[in-house]
Amino acid sequence: MQAYFDQLDRVRYEGPQSTNPLAFRHYNPDELVLGKRMEDHLRFAACYWHTFCWNGADMFGVGAFNRPWQQPGEALELAKRKADVAFEFFHKLNVPFYCFHDVDVSPEGASLKEYKNNFAQMVDVLAAKQEQSGVKLLWGTANCFTNPRYGAGAATNPDPEVFSWAATQVVTAMNATHKLGGENYVLWGGREGYETLLNTDLRQEREQIGRFMQMVVEHKHKMGFQGTLLIEPKPQEPTKHQYDYDVATVYGFLKQFGLEKEIKVNIEANHATLAGHSFHHEIATAIALGIFGSVDANRGDAQLGWDTDQFPISVEENALVMYEILKAGGFTTGGLNFDAKVRRQSTDKYDLFYGHIGAMDTMALSLKIAARMVEDGELDKRVAKRYAGWNSELGQQILKGQLSLGELAQYAEQHNLAPVHQSGHQELLENLVNRYLFDK
């Protein structure tokens, strides 16, 4: 079959001095960083939906891209053509993983029977493509938010029949992910929220989605899936308020339904922005709570209040993110999926490569800077010094529950405690980070 990206053989590493826009300047898959291959640290994935499904339409304009597989025709044949181009792209970009929603790769059809039959055929196609290319599935998921039936949510829908349809999609997508060797399964609550409290029963909807997630966990164990289940937090859009608002909110939900040992989080940078947090904050919070799983690497626009899904280009932001991930031991089943899309005006098909190449170089350079921060250890030393008092006898007695509140008050009075504030040295630490970022 004629190659779609026929002017490119493969994107290769050419080094920082290269001016070739179709080459990596910082991402060298085999380069060792802290004794581990860069490819194994970063575990890059390209997403199916923004890259091959979005046609360039927005709220104010029709599709602008005119991709061959987005033209009128027989749905399954177009899906197979899309798979041909997708795996050509994955191979030429040199990414080890990809991610998909069920209806990204397969026509939804007019009934559950058609949906399942179409998906089964496309899973066989994807399995063959994976075998031929060596590209693996980082995670799969089900799109339970686009179809009008999900206008009021899927698991939180007031109609149990919609809940049941969503369950069918999730079971089918989980089975497909398992068959394709996927390392994770993601649950994003696209419309699991509300537009107005005037017609919403919060307790009822919370019970529904809690039971849905328990059923997902039960099915995971029943089918023998060894991968990780991931919830992707997002505060709003498309609904006014979503129940998986941010990492801390998701953790509270998991604790309520006894799922904190079963489900982790897939953190998207742009969703952190929408929640009023930094990407760094959400990563660090997930690690502190023991639920860090995977990352959707992108960026938002601080001037815009919606999910712009741009490619990550800030080394300053992502070096701190990679620093937290390295300190936590790195990814296990997760990775860096580029949940990002070219701009509507970027109509050249090679713009898809430019966006991903820049993002991969950004994350590779961020990794190398983060590794220097880890090796130097200065930030860790200063944090340890700041909290050193908690290693004292008093600090340990407090943490181990050996002193009551009253006993602690008595201790303070008996020892005439008069603590003096110690500087947090924020400016010094910010300057230190700049040295890692900008000094050769």
Curated annotation (Swiss-Prot):
It catalyses: alpha-D-xylose = alpha-D-xylulofuranose. Keywords: Carbohydrate metabolism, Cytoplasm, Isomerase, Magnesium, Metal-binding, Xylose metabolism. It is found in: Cytoplasm. Mg(2+) 1 binds at residues 232, 268, 296, 339. InterPro entries: Xyl_isomerase-like_sf (IPR036237), Xylose_isom_bac (IPR013452), Xylose_isomerase (IPR001998). This is Xylose isomerase. GO terms for biological process: D-xylose metabolic process. It comes from Salmonella dublin (strain CT_02021853). NCBIfam families: PRK05474.1 (NF003998), xylose_isom_A (TIGR02630). Its EC number is 5.3.1.5. Binds 2 magnesium ions per subunit. HAMAP family: Xylose_isom_A. One of its GO terms (molecular function) is magnesium ion binding. Mg(2+) 2 binds at residues 268, 271, 307, 309. It comes from the Bacteria. It is an enzyme of class 5 (isomerase). Its cofactor is Mg(2+). Belongs to the xylose isomerase family. GO terms for cellular component: cytoplasm. PANTHER family: PTHR48408, XYLOSE ISOMERASE (PTHR48408:SF1). The active site is at residues 101, 104. Homotetramer.
